[in-house]
From Swiss-Prot:
Pfam families (UniProt xref): UDG
GO cellular component, one term: cytoplasm
GO biological process terms held by the UniProt record: base-excision repair, AP site formation via deaminated base removal
PANTHER family xrefs: URACIL-DNA GLYCOSYLASE
Cell location: Cytoplasm
PROSITE patterns, per database record: U_DNA_GLYCOSYLASE (PS00130)
EC annotation from Swiss-Prot or TrEMBL: 3.2.2.27
Active-site residues from the entry: 67
Protein's UniProt name: Uracil-DNA glycosylase
Keywords: Cytoplasm, DNA damage, DNA repair, Hydrolase
Catalytic activity: Hydrolyzes single-stranded DNA or mismatched double-stranded DNA and polynucleotides, releasing free uracil
Length: 225
C-alpha cells in the first residue's frame, strides 16, 4: 500500500505555485540581473538544490536559513552549506562545534552538507538567490512567498518532520507549522553574535534523532567525515 507521502512530490505540491505570475517574475528578475553583468549566487543550476537533493517524500528534518552566502564559491543551494574546499563560515563552524559537543562526532574537515540533504534534511533558505557582496539583496523579490509555500506543504506532510528553527527569523516561520504531528525545536542563531546565548548546548542533533526514533522514521547520520 502506498502512503500519501509516497505519492506526493515537490512537483505535485508546488506545481501550481510555480505557475503563479510572481514565480516567473522572480526567475525573470534573476535572469535580467545576470544578463546585466551582476554576479548572483548560487549559480543558476544550483538555485533549487535543496528541493532536488531532498525529495518531498523523504523530508525528515528541516533547517531554515535566511539568505544564500554572498561570497565567491560558497553558496550552492543548501542553507549553511559551502562547496568542498571552501572554508566553513563562522555560523557553520558553530554548528559543527555543537554537533561535536552533542554527539561526539569529529568536527568535519569541510562544510559540504550534501550528505545531510540526501538523508532527508531539507536545508532551505528563505531567499534562494543573492547578489554578490550584498546580503539580503533578494529578500524582497518574491522568494519568501515561494519558500513559505514550501513550509506550508511540509506542514501537510503525512509523516512527522522535525523543524530546527535557529534565530528569530527562522522562528517566525513556526506560525506556518500548525500540524501538531510535527516537532519544532528552537534555539538562537549559530552566528558568532548569538551562538553563546543558547545555540551552543541546544543538542538539537541528538534531540532530532530521538524524536525521529520515537516516531519510527530512522535517524540522521550527522557525521560528515
Amino acid at each position: 500500500m502506498t502512503t500519501m507521502a509516497e505519492t506526493q512530490t515537490w512537483q505535485t505540491v508546488l506545481g501550481e505555485e510555480k505557475q503563479e505570475p510572481y514565480f516567473q517574475e522572480i526567475l525573470d528578475f534573476v535572469k535580467k540581473e545576470r544578463k546585466a553583468g551582476k554576479i548572483i549566487y548560487p549559480p543558476q543550476k544550483d538555485i533549487f538544490n535543496a528541493l532536488k537533493l531532498t525529495p518531498y517524500e523523504a523530508v525528515k528534518v528541516v533547517i531554515l536559513g535566511q539568505d544564500p552566502y554572498h561570497g565567491p564559491n560558497q553558496a550552492h543551494g543548501l542553507a549553511f552549506s559551502v562547496r568542498p574546499g571552501v572554508p566553513a563560515p563562522p555560523s557553520l563552524q558553530n554548528i559543527f562545534k555543537e554537533l561535536h559537543a552533542d554527539l561526539g562526532v569529529s568536527i568535519p574537515s569541510h562544510g559540504f552538507l550534501e550528505k545531510w540533504a540526501k538523508q532527508g534534511v531539507l536545508l532551505l533558505n528563505a531567499a534562494l538567490t543573492v547578489e554578490a557582496g550584498k546580503p539580503q539583496s533578494h529578500a524582497n523579490i518574491g522568494w519568501h512567498r515561494f519558500t513559505d509555500k514550501v513550509i506550508e506543504s511540509l506542514n501537510d506532510h503525512p509523516e512527522v518532520i522535525v523543524f530546527l528553527l535557529w534565530g528569530s527569523y527562522a522562528q517566525k516561520k513556526s506560525q506556518l507549522i500548525t500540524n501538531l504531528r510535527h516537532r519544532i525545536l528552537k534555539a538562537p542563531h549559530p552566528s558568532p553574535l548569538s551562538a553563546a546565548r543558547g545555540f551552543l548546548g541546544c543538542r538539537h542533533f541528538s534531540k532530532a534523532n530521538q524524536l525521529l526514533h520515537e516516531m519510527g522514521r530512522g535517524e540522521i547520520d550527522w557525521a560528515l567525515d
